[in-house]
Amino acid sequence: ESAPWIKNYQLADIEPFTYTSRDGIKLHGYITLPPNYKDGEKIPFIIHPHGGPNARDYWGYNPEVQFYATRGYGVIQMDYRGSTGYGRKEMILANHQMGKKMQEDKYDALMWANDQGYVDMDNVCISGASYGGYAAMQAATKNPELFKCIIAYVGVYDLTSMDLRGLQWSEL
């Protein structure tokens, strides 16, 4: 047993889902509901976009998602346009779309979960790191009415310098 302490806790199941963006693109994601979730119950949700954007989420254990879910939150992880593993065509759909259609993909995943009857729309948060942090900050400025809280850490906040290499400072 590599982690015997885990059996003391009930972990939440992660399930794949497919949704359609507002402009008709078929996208994929994962939804995690709390272990004690009751059918038909509307619960607080956390939208959790991955970093990257040239990355993706995977169907497997994620300690941050489990932390949220075991405390009563539903969690949506979505592979928005530009996520890896879906081919060149989807990568091209992301060109020049940071803060635009890539951002809308996150809201569309939330609306999918709401349409399934899961979401208490008065208690939605967005949380992310790296590009996910950027997406969270975009949510704060573009759609603050959707979110009760914004959690952004180690984010990409300066797109102009995002692709610069090397040290971006000098000694005084």
Labelled PLM ranges:
Residues 78-172:
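Active-site-proximal cap/loop segments of hydrolase catalytic domains
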Residues 32, 48-49, 127:
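Short hydrophobic segments within beta-strands
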Residues 1-41, 63-66, 70:
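Non-catalytic accessory segments flanking enzyme active sites
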